[in-house]
Amino acid sequence: MVSFKSLLVLCCAALGAFATPVGSEDLAAREASLLERSTPSSTGWSNGYYYSFWTDGGGDVTYTNGAGGSYTVQWSNVGNFVGGKGWNPGSTRTINYGGSFNPSGNGYLAVYGWTQNPLIEYYIVESYGTYNPGSGGQHRGTVYSDGATYDIYTATRYNAPSIEGTATFEQFWSVRQSKRTGGTVTTANHFNAWAALGMRLGTHNYQIVATEGYQSSGSASITVY
């Protein structure tokens, strides 16, 4: 993304130089406008909540931290991104959230996190767009939690991005059968159900309520409590 955007800025600057004289302030404003179209990958703390935002650099995606546990994200023709707010480290906490989630194509709204030793990427999916993310994995069972049934899946990612760099690791999924964009997620119910199926988490790293987009467009505005 950085190299693409930098190239785009340089091209626009060159075109401007050939077309009409441009002052340094005008050129700087033009470059800033172009660069603001996408948010670079970053992690940190915002208003008492941990946030994580990652993008592969494809398309345009703007992630913005708001007050408290809120954030917004807008994306257009992206490759892949995932971002949101929550906690670091994660735990078997009860999570409350609300807002709007409007994907056009493939996107997920989920409690999302990582553990280490073993390295596990996990999702508790509350809503999704045109593609059920569990359909590419192995169905392991179901769990009833917070008023609905979730299907449980596992999958393996090979040589994929992770919190430890490029790695091969397991994914654990709980996918809610009835989609929603607000409510309570009792993570202990999912973690216990996974453990009963031999799906063991490691030591918790971060845990967020995330929006993810894959080769799609859309918008979301989410608040974590």
Swiss-Prot record:
Its EC number is 3.2.1.8. The active site is at E121 (nucleophile), E212 (proton donor). Transmembrane segments: none annotated. Residues 37-225 form the GH11 domain. It catalyses: Endohydrolysis of (1->4)-beta-D-xylosidic linkages in xylans. It comes from the Eukaryota. InterPro entries: ConA-like_dom_sf, GH11/12, GH11_AS_1, GH11_AS_2, GH11_dom, Glyco_hydro_11. Keywords: Carbohydrate metabolism, Glycosidase, Hydrolase, Polysaccharide degradation, Secreted, Signal, Xylan degradation. Induction: Expressed in the presence of D-xylose under conditions of alkaline ambient pH, probably under the regulation of the pacC transcription factor. Repressed in presence of glucose through the action of the creA transcription repressor. GO terms for cellular component: extracellular region. Optimum pH is 5.4. Belongs to the glycosyl hydrolase 11 (cellulase G) family. Endo-1,4-beta-xylanase involved in the hydrolysis of xylan, a major structural heterogeneous polysaccharide found in plant biomass representing the second most abundant polysaccharide in the biosphere, after cellulose. This is Endo-1,4-beta-xylanase A. It comes from Emericella nidulans (strain FGSC A4 / ATCC 38163 / CBS 112.46 / NRRL 194 / M139).
